[in-house]
Regions:
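N-terminal Rossmann-like NAD(P) cofactor-binding module of classical short-chain dehydrogenase/reductase
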Residues: 82-83, 107
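Conserved beta-strand elements of the Class I
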Residues: 20-21
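Glycine-rich, highly charged phosphate/nucleotide-binding loops
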Residues: 1-6, 57-77, 83-92
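Rossmann-fold NAD(P) dinucleotide-binding segment
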Residues: 90-106
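Rossmann-fold NAD(P)-binding glycine/threonine-rich loop
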Residues: 110-138
């Protein structure tokens, strides 16, 4: 059974992170992913939209998949967290991409649950949070 990391570990991740790739980020302002991404920008994070149907979202160039992340990263920049707004059936493939790209942290947004994919990510050494809202967790931190 998958267990989320302890609150202090999550807080440490969110304080250290600088760049967040958001898989499934919508250009539609009414979608939850858009609101979360905008709030994350206000918190000072650089966001990278991962959406095959968008050129840019919230002023940032979009990439069609996680495999294209290197195309938009500076030479000294890395993705610290992959935040996912996709349905369960897409999660296993996203986890495999995170493993292949050696991305350090995976965040499955509230309502996104895939126990076996989350366990696979943890087994591969990826810090994994599931079924929690990254925005709410970050907003609750005292800087």
């Amino acid at each position: 059974m998958f267990l989320n990391p302890k609150a202090e570990e999550v807080a440490k991740l969110l304080r250290a992170a600088r760049t967040i790739a958001i898989v499934g980020l919508s250009p539609d302002r009414t979608r939850p992913s858009h609101g979360v991404a905008k709030a994350l920008q206000r918190f000072g994070y650089r966001i990278i939209p991962v959406n095959p149907f968008a050129e840019s979202i919230l002023g940032e160039p979009a990439v069609p998949s996680l495999d294209q992340l290197p195309e938009v990263l500076a030479s000294d920049e890395r993705v610290d967290v992959v935040d996912v707004f996709r349905r369960r059936e897409h999660i296993a493939g996203i986890v495999e991409a995170c493993i292949r790209l050696q991305l350090p942290a995976l965040w499955l947004q509230e309502g996104v649950v895939d126990e076996s994919a989350a366990a696979r990510a943890v087994q591969a050494g990826i810090f994994t949070v599931m079924d929690r809202c990254l925005f709410r967790e970050r907003a609750a931190l005292r800087d």
